[in-house]
């Protein structure tokens, strides 16, 4: 083996190019000047390096060291990119070793298709670092990590990416510079496996062994999706692998056709005991799922220069009003609309999954199909692109008669980059006014105005609200958007107060926004880490109301969850509950709120994880999970009593 330095003019040219690249990074992200100088010196030395290896056993040993060492280096660089020193220190050694093995599997699989170990290392390292970079920005934008189920959401993410600011920190710059040095070094090592078939067999065998070992060691490991827990508890690469595992839904304990039949026998009536049937005319039902609409005071108290939502706060007649648990934070809106429309819960699905893109069947029974079965015309409105979250495919399957997307709205009526709530509500009014005589109308609308992020400034948006004391620009913009939503809401309610036909309006937020961590720390004293279950559920709490333009009892609801809201809306409208909604109405008495994080225990007076449930609470949760599994995954034996879908 011979190692020598050979200085050439071409290396100086390469150095100049590399230093220009590094200088641009230095301009974008200020870091110590000695790092820039050190990078230049190392790069020039590496490019001037010549390595010659003749001994075949030394080549073999170098191949092994290069693959194993590169895997370990990549795994640690991923962690360095994503976590600060304090969080990096939290991961246990055995989990870090599993992350190295995950990276090694990638290297081995790539090696099967290449003879050159250096090329394998470059491809594998760059692929894994780009992958980690995607997670770096995803976490920056939405406050939780990129996992396997997000792959189906790439088109949606790209469509709103322009509204976010892409910012690198110093760790990201160091990772980029170190990767450049690594690639330059590996290119200097020219070693190959001469016997390709033998090499492929060995690589595949080791990869299979690694996968089996990882599977055995992680059998009881939970995929983490909250904030950066996946990275500092499991390691990001391993956590992502676990999210792949979670896409396969297992049959719940105690599931059988006989158990479903027993439940059918309990809920096969007409539901008249649940609702008031003395209604002369079915009401028009309008649902507004308001993008990122939240009452941040549930997280902690704060002061503003003006009241944020004065009109919403003033509503008190003919209204059921309160707070509901969502299953998502900062993103994944369709899971909230799915919970509302179907009555199902994300509690029994893998963390981070998106139902619209993974689990929608050909016959998804919901409030849409139920209302359509009793003569309603069902309309969906969303002032954004139809391909977002695959809504253009999902909505017709759900049974909607009409769908209205961005091209059906006035695209000059924008606040920041999104169509305003006012324009959405005017479109709702327009559709109501154009309805046929005796047409029963159901409108499901999803707004877009308040979508994150909240850091960029816009000439078409005058921010009126600001927090007093510590001020955060993203929080001020978000609260100002809520203030605009409140004005639009007043228009919507005022209009339908004046019409003669009965109208019910259901309004709720899909999830809380992802804002500056320090802002949350000012609210609850902790930020987003180290929270109790009750404090964590506060971040998943959104406001809701069910209002009618005719006389109904005013009711305050301390806590419920989105999966119950459609049942509550049907009850309030005087419409007979289908069997599944009857079940949910009964369950709500014992389990008033349930979401992806846990449930509210009436007996204990606090939130708990599902696995902590005992007695009657556990029985209701088990029945719920059995029915949801039957609905979504046991198509051959799907209950026609609970899930009739469309009857016409």
Residue ranges and their predicted role:
Residues 268-280, 290, 295-648:
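Solvent-exposed soluble domains appended to multi-pass membrane proteins
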Residues 52-59, 237, 241, 248-265, ...:
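Extended hydrophobic/aromatic-rich secondary-structure runs
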Residues 213-287:
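Membrane-interface segments at or immediately adjacent to transmembrane helices
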Residues 3-30, 34-52, 174-182, 195-196, ...:
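N-terminal leader/auxiliary helical segments
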Residues 151-154, 234-237, 241, 309, ...:
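Alpha-helix initiation and N-capping motif
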Residues 8, 137, 141-147, 169, ...:
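A diffuse structural propensity rather than consistent per-protein peaks
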Residues 2-231:
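Transmembrane and membrane-interface helices of multi-pass
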């Amino acid at each position: 083996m011979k190692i020598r330095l050979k200085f050439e003019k071409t290396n100086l040219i390469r150095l100049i190019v590399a230093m220009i690249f590094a200088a641009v990074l230095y301009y974008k992200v200020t870091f110590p000047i000695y790092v820039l100088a050190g990078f230049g010196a190392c790069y020039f030395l590496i490019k001037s390096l010549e390595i010659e290896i003749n001994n075949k056993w030394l080549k073999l040993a170098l191949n092994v060291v290069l693959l194993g060492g590169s895997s370990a280096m990549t795994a640690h660089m991923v962690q360095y990119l994503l976590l600060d020193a304090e969080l990096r220190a939290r991961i246990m050694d055995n989990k870090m070793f599993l992350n190295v093995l995950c990276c090694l599997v990638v290297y081995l699989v790539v090696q099967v298709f290449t003879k050159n170990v250096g090329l394998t290392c470059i491809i594998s390292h760059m692929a894994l670092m780009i992958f980690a970079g995607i997670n770096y920005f995803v976490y920056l934008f939405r406050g939780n990590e990129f996992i396997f189920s997000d792959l189906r959401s790439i088109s949606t993410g790209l469509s709103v990416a322009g509204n976010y600011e892409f910012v690198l920190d110093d760790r990201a710059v160091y990772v980029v510079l170190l990767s450049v040095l690594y690639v330059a070094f590996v290119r200097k090592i020219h070693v190959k496996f001469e016997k390709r078939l033998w090499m492929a067999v060995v690589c595949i065998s080791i990869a299979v062994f690694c996968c089996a070992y990882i599977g055995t060691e992680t059998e009881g490991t939970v995929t983490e999706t909250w904030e950066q827990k996946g990275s500092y508890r499991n390691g990001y690469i391993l956590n992502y692998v676990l999210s792949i595992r979670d896409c396969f839904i297992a049959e719940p304990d105690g599931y059988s056709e006989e158990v479903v039949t027993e439940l059918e026998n309990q809920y096969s009536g007409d539901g008249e005991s649940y609702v008031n049937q003395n209604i002369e005319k079915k009401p028009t039902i309008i649902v507004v799922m308001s993008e990122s609409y939240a009452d941040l005071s549930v997280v902690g108290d704060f002061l503003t220069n003006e009241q944020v939502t004065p009109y919403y706060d003033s509503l008190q007649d003919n209204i059921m009003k309160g707070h509901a648990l969502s299953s998502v934070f900062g993103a994944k809106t369709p899971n909230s609309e799915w919970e509302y429309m179907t009555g199902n819960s994300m509690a029994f699905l893998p963390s981070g999954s998106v139902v619209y893109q993974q689990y929608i069947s050909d016959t998804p029974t919901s409030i849409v199909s139920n209302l359509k079965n009793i003569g309603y015309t069902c309309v969906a409105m969303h002032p954004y692109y139809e391909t977002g979250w695959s809504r253009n495919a999902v909505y017709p399957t759900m049974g909607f008669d009409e769908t209205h997307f961005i091209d059906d709205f006035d695209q000059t009526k924008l606040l920041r980059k999104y169509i305003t709530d006012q324009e959405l509500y005017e479109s709702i009014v327009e559709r109501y006014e154009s309805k046929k005589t005796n047409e029963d109308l159901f409108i499901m609308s999803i707004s877009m105005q308040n979508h994150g992020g909240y850091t960029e400034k816009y000439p078409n948006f005058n921010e009126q609200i600001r927090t007093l004391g510590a001020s955060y620009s993203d929080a001020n913009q978000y609260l100002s958007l809520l203030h605009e939503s409140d004005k639009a809401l007043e228009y919507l309610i005022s209009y339908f107060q004046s019409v003669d036909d009965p109208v019910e309006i259901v309004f709720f937020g899909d999830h809380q926004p992802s804002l500056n961590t320090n802002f949350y720390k000012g609210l609850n004293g902790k930020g987003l880490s180290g929270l109790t279950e009750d404090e964590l559920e506060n971040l998943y709490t959104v406001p809701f109301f069910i209002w009618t333009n005719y006389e109904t009892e005013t009711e305050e609801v301390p806590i419920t969850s989105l999966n119950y809201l459609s049942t509550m809306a049907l009850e309030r409208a005087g419409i007979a509950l289908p069997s599944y909604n009857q079940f949910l109405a009964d369950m709500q008495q014992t389990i008033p709120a349930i979401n992806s994080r846990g449930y509210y225990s009436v007996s204990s007076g606090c939130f708990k994880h599902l696995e902590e449930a005992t007695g009657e609470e556990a029985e209701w949760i088990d029945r719920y999970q059995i029915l949801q599994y039957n609905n979504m995954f046991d198509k051959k034996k799907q209950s026609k009593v609970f899930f009739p879908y469309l009857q016409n």
